[in-house]
């Protein structure tokens, strides 16, 4: 693999939108995060990049046919778009059941406004 390909595969550049009261409500908060080099508007960027680097598939959806507890975690919603390790990402997060709360909690460090 050449150097350019390695850089593209390692690159992370994310746009994060958080709706503390649900996506149909205002206000919303927006942040950016880049990890190669570390930058953006997200607080604690270096720590966020380090935590992301340890996660296998932080933006994967809940698998189909999984039983989830019916626990409501709150109205918060978030959208993450951009590139993670060179792969395009478009992931929505909410706290409407146990599975979604678990997904949210894995990357909650990306959602400081919630």
Kindly give the residue locations of the regions a language model identified.
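N- and C-terminal low-complexity/disordered segments
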Residues: 1-114
